[in-house]
Amino acid sequence: LQGSGDAFQHVLAIAPLLLHLNHPQLPGYVIHAPSGIANFLASDYQKKWLTNEYSIHYADHKPSTLKSAVNFHEVLPPILGVYVMGSFGSISQTSSSDLDTWICVRDGLSPDEYTLLTQKAKRISEWAMQFNVEINFYLMDQQRFRNEHYADPLTIENSGSAQYMLLLDEFYRSAVRLAGKPLLWLHLWVENEKDYEKEVARLITEGEIDPNDWVDFGGLGQFSANEYFGASLWHLYKGIDSPYKSVLKILLLEAYSKEYPNTCLIARTFKRDLLAGNTNPDHHFDPYIAILAKVTQYLTALSEFKRLDFVHRCFYVNAKEDFARYQANNWRIRYMEILAQEWGWSAETVKHLNKRPFWKIKAVKENHDNIMKFLMLSYRNLVEFARKHHIHSSVVPQDINILSRKLYTAFEELPGKVSLLNTQISHNLSEAHLTFVEVRGNKHFKDGWYLINQPIHHIMFSKERVIEYGESLNKLVSWAYFNHLLTEKTELSIFSKNVTLSTLQRFVTNLRQSFPSTIAKQPKNSDLLNQCEIRSLFIAINLTTDPTSKIEEVLTGISSRDLFSFGSLEQSLVGSIDFTYRNVWNEIRTLHFEGQNAILLALKVLSNKIYRGVNRPDSIQVYCYSERYRQDLRQLVMGLVNRCVSIQVGDIQQPCQTSRLRVAGNNWQLFFEDRGIS
């Protein structure tokens, strides 16, 4: 616990007490909720806290002053043990680490009791958040778990049905008992884990052990290729949002799968050393140091040293998160310094990684690309593992669909899709200056838009200065905005023959009005199982091509429909249309249409993006950047877009199935059908 704050240690000390007692004055109280932990002995700290904060005097086993108010079970306590697992106490624990805590309940709790205890645990979690400590409680029935019925719904914090034995391996290698009975598995060695249940039964029959003295989730002999597949998918899912924490576990599963079916589990190694009296092994009984050693051995055998170096960097960055809070003699700092020397890192490498929270865009992009390459390679290796073992996954199908869709939205590169950089890499990517440069007909650069993070008068345009490229201005601005380079304080410049600075500034303002720069929440599982409906849509008319700027005489008294076939030349005054939209999978996508038929192409594509019978987008914003006829064009396009959307989502129950438009001198008949406009 060295380096953890007072609040963290306070929550860790008091949480078991609050599970043991159920008193109206105490945090976590729920009327009639089961309470009481087997073999519970209150510490001096806990007793003092009760006395000082609530004037309650606690006496072990017989809390006489609480008897009338506490639902206290002396004979059959509902809680057999409380264990914290994961990074707790390891080199990877930081101030932001949560406390994943298993509450092992006795067999036979009624559904109502289970519900009340769940509510009590939730209230204790809420109490802990007052100290900025996140503690997650999981009620675990050992018999239910042993029968592989641990299949709660998949969430960002819960693997659902994706892993069972692997979760138990992690629990056994990292669990620390806070209160209650000890774990039988840690005290009983068998040569083959498949024989564990038989050995336990034999010892019970011969009277050598009393099962009531222990908590037992069973042995580790039921691994399957299917479970490796499901668990690896889930950790890849976690790795998208929390790469530094997940990289090591992803590689551990890959190393385990290579050894399958004769996997050498870390939990088994720990138990062997404990029972052999080896109190000072290389892993120091630190689960994360042991994982690092296992992964290092695996990658070294494959001669994948670049991949190993990336793992080292992720491990260092994750462990380094809180080093500024530690004293110089902290064991975590000393150990990481030893590792950096063993890895042969230069002082410059260490300095660069220490500055990771303050990296700017080029370093962040490089790191983000490395993370994506790593995850993609792990995904390909996982697919190969599935083929090798002919996996027809027994993971709940809904889980697999959710996991696959999450990976799909993160990995797939599509034209117009805005790549969102991982927000954990750096604390602040904002730029003081951004310049957008349009290039056409240059033999050294492909046509499109280039972004430079310097003011225009400092630019010597070169590939080395470019931080991002986009085929359209819309996509490039969206990339800068949603990745937080472009803020309200950013000074903008533009180098273009077609777009003025004032137009760019108005476009950025409208984009900011239409979308928050930060996506506040993860998509719901139900959303990931459905089609990628458009949630918010922003449409820009004539952003990069404005035919009205070349009109010498403004005509009056014309029909709005004439704007698509204007004057004697019958020219469409819509030269370009840009879409920016966020879908229910929380992807940001852009589309660009240009030319005399831009309006037709845009409507056709939009009708295919709005699926029949889905919800109407939460918002549709239309802006026009024309020099002339700005309001007329905006109203005309907005009307067509709203009609198209209304027909597709079913707001118009009996729509006119056709619509006639004259565009650039040609008459077009639009047919609204199930598959969109044709």
Model regions: which residues?
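E2/UBC-UEV (E2-variant) core
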Residues: 116, 120-134
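Nucleotidyltransferase catalytic cores
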Residues: 1-56, 147-155, 172-678
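Short linear interaction motifs
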Residues: 60-67, 76-85, 291-299
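Catalytic metal-binding acidic patch
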Residues: 83, 90-116, 134-138
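Extended, Lys/Arg-enriched charged tracts that mediate electrostatic binding to polyanionic substrates
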Residues: 41-78
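Catalytic micro-motifs at enzyme active sites that drive phosphoryl/nucleotidyl and oxygen chemistry
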Residues: 68-73, 81-93, 124-127
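Acidic, Ser/Thr-rich peripheral helices and adjacent loops at domain boundaries
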Residues: 155-164
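Short, conserved secondary-structure transition motifs
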Residues: 133-155
